[in-house]
Amino acid sequence: MSIKTILWPTDLSRYSREAIDDVVSLSNKYDAKVVVLYSTVDLCSYFPAYGNYPNPERLNDFRDWEVERARKALNKLCDEELRNCPLIEIRLAHGDPVKNILEHAELEQADLIVLSSHGLGREKKNTPADVIGSVTDRIIKQSPVSVHVVKNK
């Protein structure tokens, strides 16, 4: 088995971070590059249900704020937690996380996707531990490459 590129999608939740040890271990075992992917929220997808769109400038301002916040958090995470990986690259995408993960798996020519069994949804909704998260479930079913799932504690 040859693994040159590992894609680690994260929503920066505490559950998502539980995959860090496996990401570091696998990247060192295979001397693989780690691509860290964060997907920003597409706020426009929420507004049709409410009837009115907010001012586009405000949406852009919020998106810019979220991207900057995510970039800072990802840089800190990589500096503190992934510093022992051979090579790290950060990617930010906008929109549906599943779509972004699948697209980046192909774009980055990932050999492996590493995910935690749950992410932000479990933090917000208190999803039972025995139910796999919706993003992870969809990636397992649709991924063109192998998926390594880290069971959350």
Kindly give the residue locations of the regions a language model identified.
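A short acidic, glycine-rich active-site loop
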Residues: 55-72
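Small/aliphatic-rich secondary-structure junction motif
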Residues: 1-56
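Generic structural signal for helix capping and beta-alpha/helix-loop junctions
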Residues: 43-44, 100, 122
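Short beta->alpha linker loops
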Residues: 69, 92-96, 153
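General small-molecule cofactor/ligand-binding pocket signal
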Residues: 35-37, 89-93, 148
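Gly/Ser-rich helix-loop-strand patches that form or flank binding pockets
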Residues: 104-153
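Structural beta-alpha unit
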Residues: 1, 15, 79-113
